[in-house]
Swiss-Prot record:
<feature type="domain" description="Cupin type-1 1">
    <location>
        <begin position="49"/>
        <end position="301"/>
    </location>
</feature>
<feature type="domain" description="Cupin type-1 2">
    <location>
        <begin position="360"/>
        <end position="509"/>
    </location>
</feature>
<dbReference type="InterPro" id="IPR006044">
    <property type="entry name" value="11S_seedstore_pln"/>
</dbReference>
<feature type="region of interest" description="Disordered">
    <location>
        <begin position="241"/>
        <end position="272"/>
    </location>
</feature>
<dbReference type="Pfam" id="PF00190">
    <property type="entry name" value="Cupin_1"/>
</dbReference>
<feature type="region of interest" description="Disordered">
    <location>
        <begin position="326"/>
        <end position="346"/>
    </location>
</feature>
<comment type="similarity">
    <text>Belongs to the 11S seed storage protein (globulins) family.</text>
</comment>
<dbReference type="InterPro" id="IPR011051">
    <property type="entry name" value="RmlC_Cupin_sf"/>
</dbReference>
<comment type="subunit">
    <text>Hexamer; each subunit is composed of an acidic and a basic chain derived from a single precursor and linked by a disulfide bond.</text>
</comment>
<keyword id="KW-0732">Signal</keyword>
<feature type="compositionally biased region" description="Basic and acidic residues">
    <location>
        <begin position="326"/>
        <end position="340"/>
    </location>
</feature>
<dbReference type="InterPro" id="IPR050253">
    <property type="entry name" value="Seed_Storage-Functional"/>
</dbReference>
<keyword id="KW-0708">Seed storage protein</keyword>
<keyword id="KW-0758">Storage protein</keyword>
<feature type="disulfide bond">
    <location>
        <begin position="44"/>
        <end position="77"/>
    </location>
</feature>
<keyword id="KW-0020">Allergen</keyword>
<keyword id="KW-1015">Disulfide bond</keyword>
Length: 538
């Protein structure tokens, strides 16, 4: 009886432990700390918005990292940090993790993305086998023989030495078997332009450009997220590499910051936190040698990034990755689900997180959520079609407007948004809570415009059209249009509109039903333009 009680108690503890590990990934309303979004609300008294481009560029061996000035009122209000990364062909963005969740949009190019989630199994295996290094095997064999010859004069420790030798032999045999099986690792997948790639805080990701053109991506960090347990600054922790600046240069910059203005000091400090150093560089050689057995001093030095001036985007050499096609990924995921369902066993974390997709493309017209053949389309990625977004409370929307087409006016009910223009140019107007314009200007490719929650925005494309991606800090961000078939005015009775605007019921009816389109509107056309269009179609 006592044995059964002990077993039951142990099982309960194990279940509680697994649940505790999953809590950090659950939605933020239940675990948002006191220093989250509420702390920075006083910074949202915005009088003017700006469409901005990157203010700082950090060069590496095989690419460039561009950082927006996130010390502006709108960036601090939203808690956003924006970074654009350009990886040259053959370049590798080194593995790193962040203290804040983020969402990445691939603007241009193709490549390979790797994701490492703590606690998840290594389900990928390379197709090629490795040959166990002959030199190491021969050297260890000679060391073993030398040890055996010397044990004749040390009979008192013979049994301990034999046991150690057997342990070394088993270790060498196990290592040799691992080499013969090939390399095992966590998931990797192909990425291309239009892909949205999310990442929770603390999850390691890396990117390789295996294409022929530059791989360009824009990343938005949510510094105010419940997953960020530090302050409002975003920090990247790299597992390899080193900044191109020497430690002496960084010390000199710190001293300059102390003597400079507060604003410049904050900007430099924030940028340095994003791209400063390899986290392994702070550990002593002796500790690393004890942890990573069977590696020489040169490898330890390279782990710490000593004398490494390549930066955090390096030129990869002989990097050949066996990447599954998309249909193979889906098949593998389905097989895993059936296997777990049939066995009835699961470790909880695997079902909840390890098998979630880390990619969704928003540049496919066939999957548009809103489509107007004469105006444009909207593709949305949220937790409904990419469930991992529920864990990080971020989402994305890709909008394509044709020539002179209009989107809006509309506002975000539950999120701030950052509009990043990917093609074309157009005019944007934003109106704040005081009923006056806080932005009225043209935007073009490469600019970001932050629109706070509740601010109404309208966009009109230019002659070449306008495309942009909106990155939002809610996994199910909701917009409310003011005009159109699904608008707020359409849902209000005619009599209420007539009294609200002091107009006749006839005018209120026209106001309410003037547009039958949904969010994306074709441009106004005169009678002559309509006739010319009809004639050209015929």
């Amino acid at each position: 009886m006592s044995t059964k009680l002990i077993l039951s108690f142990s099982l309960c503890l194990m279940v509680l432990s697994c649940s505790a590990q999953l809590l950090p990934w659950q939605k933020g309303q239940r675990s948002r700390p006191h220093h989250g979004h509420q702390q920075f609300q006083h910074q949202c008294d915005i009088q003017r918005l700006t469409a901005s481009e990157p203010s700082r560029r950090v060069r590496s061996e095989a690419g460039v990292t561009e950082i927006w000035d996130h010390d502006t009122p709108e960036f601090r209000c939203a808690g956003f940090v924006a970074v654009r990364v350009v990886i040259q062909p053959g370049g590798l963005l080194l593995p790193s993790y962040s203290n804040a969740p983020y969402i990445t949009f691939v603007e241009q190019g193709r490549g390979v993305q790797g994701v490492v989630v703590p606690g998840c199994p290594e389900t990928f295996q390379s197709g090629s086998e490795f040959e166990y290094p002959r030199s190491q095997r021969d050297q260890r064999s000679r060391q073993s023989e030398s040890g055996e010859s010397s044990r004749g004069d040390q009979r008192s420790r013979q049994s301990e030495s034999e046991e150690s030798s057997r342990g070394d032999q088993r270790s060498r045999q196990s290592e040799s078997e691992e080499f013969s099986r090939g390399d095992q690792h966590q998931k990797i997948f192909r990425i291309r332009d239009g892909d949205v790639i999310p990442s929770p805080a603390g999850v390691v990701q890396w990117t390789h450009n295996n294409g022929d053109n530059d791989l360009i991506s824009i990343t938005l960090y949510d510094a105010n997220s419940f997953q960020n347990q530090l302050d409002e600054n975003v920090r990247n922790f790299f597992l390899a590499g080193q900044s191109k600046q020497s430690r002496e240069d960084r010390r000199s910059q710190r001293q300059t910051r102390e003597e400079g203005s507060d604003r410049q000091s904050r900007e430099s400090q924030d940028d340095e936190a994003l791209l400063e150093a390899n986290i392994l560089s702070g550990f002593e050689d002796e500790i690393l040698q004890e942890i990573f057995r069977n590696v020489d001093q040169e490898t330890i030095s390279k782990l710490r990034g000593e004398n490494d001036q390549r930066g955090f985007i390096v030129q990869a050499r002989d990097l050949k990755l066996r990447v599954p096609e998309e249909y193979e990924e889906e098949l593998q995921r389905e097989r895993g689900d059936r296997k777990r369902g049939g066995s009835g066993r699961s470790n909880g974390l695997e079902q909840a997180f390890c098998n979630l997709k880390f990619r969704q493309n928003v540049n496919r017209p066939s999957r548009a959520d809103v489509f107007n053949p004469r105006a444009g389309r909207i593709n949305t990625v949220d937790s409904n079609n990419l469930p991992i977004l529920e864990f990080i409370q971020l989402s994305a929307q890709h909008v394509v407007l044709y020539k002179n087409a209009i989107l809006g006016p509309r506002w975000n009910l539950n999120a701030h948004s950052a509009l990043y223009v990917t093609r074309g140019e157009g005019r944007v107007q934003v109106v704040g809570d005081e009923g006056r314009s806080v932005f009225d200007d043209n935007v073009q490719r490469g600019q970001i415009l932050v629109v706070p929650q509740g601010f109404a925005v309208v966009l009109k494309a230019g002659r070449e059209g306008l495309e942009w991606v909106e990155l939002k800090n809610d996994d199910n961000a909701i917009t409310s249009p003011i005009a159109g078939k699904t608008s707020v005015l359409r849902a209000i009775p005619v009599e209420v509109l007539a009294n609200s605007y002091d107009i006749s019921t006839k005018e209120a009816f026209r106001l309410k039903n003037g547009r039958q389109e949904v969010e994306v509107f074709r441009p106004f056309q005169s009678r002559d333009e309509k006739e010319r269009e009809r004639f050209s179609i015929v």
